[in-house]
Amino acid sequence: MSYILALDQGTTSSRAIVFDTTATIRAIAQREFRQIFPRPGWVEHDGREIWATQVGVAAEALTRAGISPREVRAIGITNQRETTLLWDRRSGEPLHNAIVWQDRRTAELCDRLKADGLEPLFRQKTGLVLDAYFSGTKLAWLLEAIPGARSRAEAGELAFGTVDSWLAWNLSGGKLHVTDASNASRTLLFNITTLDWDDELLAILGIPRAVLPRVVDSGAVYGETAGDIFAAAIPLAGMAGDQQAALFGQACGTAGMAKNTYGTGCFLLMHCGTRPIESRHNLLTTVAWQLGGRAEYALEGSVFVAGAAVQWLRDGLGIIRSSGEVEALAASVPDSGGVCLVPAFTGLGAPHWDPYARGTIVGITRGTTAAHIARATLESIAFQSADLLTAMEADAGISLAELRVDGGATANGLLMQFQADLLGVPVVRPRISETTALGAAYLAGLAVGLWRDRQEIAGHWQVDRIFEPAMGREQAAELRGRWGRAVERARGWAAP
């Protein structure tokens, strides 16, 4: 039998998963690595540690699966997006720690660019908002902060990359300096219409083209592993950012299909076809993937606090001992008793984008119990996701037929049922929850002919459970109206 090795490089750990030709998981290996916080608001990773943990778990997964590298048809890479590295092309050594997507050190630069009236230009070309979250301003900071870096970059001595590029460089022994279009579209430097680095944006940020990777398809044979890494040369054949890979792994391959990943936060993506849609509701437009030189696009929105709100019930309020207890506690009451909890602990993301919003609980009476607070917390995850989906439907002009879900919180049946009730469409949980790694495996497998086409891949996608909406639309509208009033009370609370 043939196998695909998926490398899933995340924010807190590096993982490797071996899939067989039926898309069944044969082995998983995982290692955490250090989070580095040099100053408040700064978040870094050691690029060497990312590489060491990733290659380590790859070897471990092959051992656990009981297979040799010669049986691996291809490697697919998926990664934490936006995290920025700069390294020496000759030595392969990073010049600085990786600047992580969560890092806010370039917020002032973004504010200056906005004050200069440049946000509409960036938005129109990249589909993104001008925010420190994305890679472009992080790279500009590195070129400015490291002595001599800009002149060395101009001379072609340095290489920039997001984590996919860094892994491909190391896996190929320094032969490949590439990124796929889905990762490139998260940099603030890539024009999502021309599918190329944008010279006007590069000039604004002072970034030389010579430092940038070549942009490639999300599924294609780019090269192979260097001889001393595994006991065989394995084709490197798939790359995609983690959320786009999850969309592919969920077989959301046609316009209007959507997936929501429920984790610490939520990431919701809707496939919107072969043309980018400019959002009118503060959503991001991104490349979903590029195959055969042709891009497909998605609308994306983020919920900052989802599972993190349940952690707060445990660690902050102490009303549960473990996150797993929240469902039983919330289910012990028939509803939230009129309580709304808006978990805007770090502001609100799309479609509101209000950094000054703060957490709010409204509707409390003497009859309110810990169970009502727990239920309102779970419901807040579904309300925030519903707000995003409504905005996406309006932007795309498409009515959602179903929502495919993944991530740890999908094990919570009460949450999934309430999500279906609010949306009025089925919520579908797949049998394989490792959809991010599966998406990378599918992209690589397609490139080497392990699977014929995307129709065959869609045939492998299997349902674990479908949550059908059971609430009347009038009641759902009433609940969403009440939620909207609660959000208004949370907004602007910490404004100067």
Swiss-Prot record:
List the InterPro entries hit by this protein, alphabetically: ATPase_NBD (IPR043129), Carb_kinase_FGGY (IPR000577), Carb_kinase_FGGY_CS (IPR018483), FGGY_C (IPR018485), FGGY_N (IPR018484), Glycerol_kin (IPR005999)
Q: How is its activity regulated?
A: Inhibited by fructose 1,6-bisphosphate (FBP).
**Any keyword Kinase?**
yes
Residues annotated to bind sn-glycerol 3-phosphate: T11, R81, E82, Y133, D242
Quick one: signal sequence residues?
Answer: none
List ligand-binding residues for ADP.
T11, R15, T264, G307, G408, N412
Locate the residues binding ATP: T11, T12, S13, T264, G307, Q311, G408
Keywords linked to the UniProt accession? ATP-binding, Glycerol metabolism, Kinase, Nucleotide-binding, Transferase
- Annotated binding of glycerol, by residue: R81, E82, Y133, D242, Q243
Any idea of its EC number?
2.7.1.30
Q: Provide the GO MF annotations for this entry.
A: ATP binding; glycerol kinase activity
Pathway per its UniProt entry is: Polyol metabolism; glycerol degradation via glycerol kinase pathway; sn-glycerol 3-phosphate from glycerol: step 1/1
Provide the Gene Ontology terms for cellular component. cytosol
Catalytic reaction(s) noted = glycerol + ATP = sn-glycerol 3-phosphate + ADP + H(+)
Q: Which residues form a coiled coil?
A: none
Give a yes or no for keyword GTP-binding in this entry.
Answer: no
Picking any one GO biological process from the record gives: glycerol-3-phosphate metabolic process
Which Pfam families does this UniProt record tie to the protein? FGGY_C (PF02782), FGGY_N (PF00370)
Q: Any idea what job this protein has?
A: Key enzyme in the regulation of glycerol uptake and metabolism. Catalyzes the phosphorylation of glycerol to yield sn-glycerol 3-phosphate.
Q: Which family does it belong to?
A: Belongs to the FGGY kinase family.
Q: Which NCBIfam families match?
A: glycerol_kin, PRK00047.1
PANTHER family (UniProt xref): GLYCEROL KINASE (PTHR10196:SF69), SUGAR KINASE (PTHR10196)
Q: What is this protein called?
A: Glycerol kinase
The source organism is: Geobacter metallireducens (strain ATCC 53774 / DSM 7210 / GS-15)
